[in-house]
């Protein structure tokens, strides 16, 4: 029984995280489009119709790039810190009062202020 609960929490967490990441990708696309119009350029319009597949192309490019690590850096810290930064950014979304919330915080607003600072 506890395994079923853990799987359901994992699924709920993924159902929270994936739309947030997709929204961030497309908001970045909108930002790039607006900045390109301000600079009298066309902006990202190569990949897909009107550049709608540009966030996917950016993600693929990010994953196939060769990781270059400074020789004096710690390998563990160099790999873990971007993951920790993403985790902290996504943690700010946890106490939002959605129909199936992940946690029930009495001080949800205080938690959101603390995580965003």
UniProtKB/Swiss-Prot annotation:
Keywords: Electron transport, Membrane, Mitochondrion, Mitochondrion inner membrane, NAD, Respiratory chain, Translocase, Transmembrane, Transmembrane helix, Transport, Ubiquinone
Topology with respect to the bilayer: Multi-pass membrane protein
GO cellular component labels: mitochondrial inner membrane
EC number from the UniProt entry: 7.1.1.2
PROSITE patterns: COMPLEX1_ND1_1 (PS00667)
Molecular function via GO: NADH dehydrogenase (ubiquinone) activity
Ranges that cross the membrane: 10-30, 76-96, 97-117
Catalytic activity as recorded in UniProt: a ubiquinone + NADH + 5 H(+)(in) = a ubiquinol + NAD(+) + 4 H(+)(out)
Subcellular location: Mitochondrion inner membrane
Top-rank lineage group of the source organism: Eukaryota
One Pfam family this sequence matches: NADHdh
One of the protein's GO biological processes: aerobic respiration
InterPro entries, alphabetized: NADH_UbQ_OxRdtase_su1/FPO (IPR001694), NADH_UbQ_OxRdtase_su1_CS (IPR018086)
PANTHER family tied to this protein: NADH DEHYDROGENASE SUBUNIT 1 (PTHR11432), NADH-UBIQUINONE OXIDOREDUCTASE CHAIN 1 (PTHR11432:SF3)
Family: Belongs to the complex I subunit 1 family.
Function: Core subunit of the mitochondrial membrane respiratory chain NADH dehydrogenase (Complex I) that is believed to belong to the minimal assembly required for catalysis. Complex I functions in the transfer of electrons from NADH to the respiratory chain. The immediate electron acceptor for the enzyme is believed to be ubiquinone.
UniProt protein name: NADH-ubiquinone oxidoreductase chain 1
Organism: Anas platyrhynchos
